[in-house]
Amino acid sequence: AIFKSYCEIIVTHFPFDEQNCSMKLGTWTYDGSVVAINPENDQPDLSNFMESGEWVIKEARGWKHRVIYACCPSTPYLDITYHF
């Protein structure tokens, strides 16, 4: 799969600027009683990451969330959000 992420670009300190980006992976089709999302650790697997001459990933971490929406108080929805 190919995933794309949008990052707000702030170039105040160009060319030494830093951006903080997020990528949220989850499902709206199946809730937490049907699908399990269990990351092996809080670091994403970057083994297939292709480096860019324009930027570097300095740090990347992920968190698992269990979200309850007002429409469905007894149904948890799961996601993993990576920040980099």
Curated annotation (Swiss-Prot):
GO cellular component terms, semicolon-separated: postsynaptic membrane
A single GO molecular function term of this UniProt record: transmembrane signaling receptor activity
Catalytic activity of the protein: K(+)(in) = K(+)(out); Na(+)(in) = Na(+)(out)
Main location (coarse class): membrane
Record key words, sorted: Cell membrane, Disulfide bond, Glycoprotein, Ion channel, Ion transport, Ligand-gated ion channel, Membrane, Postsynaptic cell membrane, Receptor, Synapse, Transmembrane, Transport
Subunit annotation: One of the alpha chains that assemble within the acetylcholine receptor, a pentamer of two alpha chains, a beta, a delta, and a gamma (in immature muscle) or epsilon (in mature muscle) chains. The muscle heteropentamer composed of alpha-1, beta-1, delta, epsilon subunits interacts with the alpha-conotoxin ImII.
Protein's name in the database: Acetylcholine receptor subunit alpha
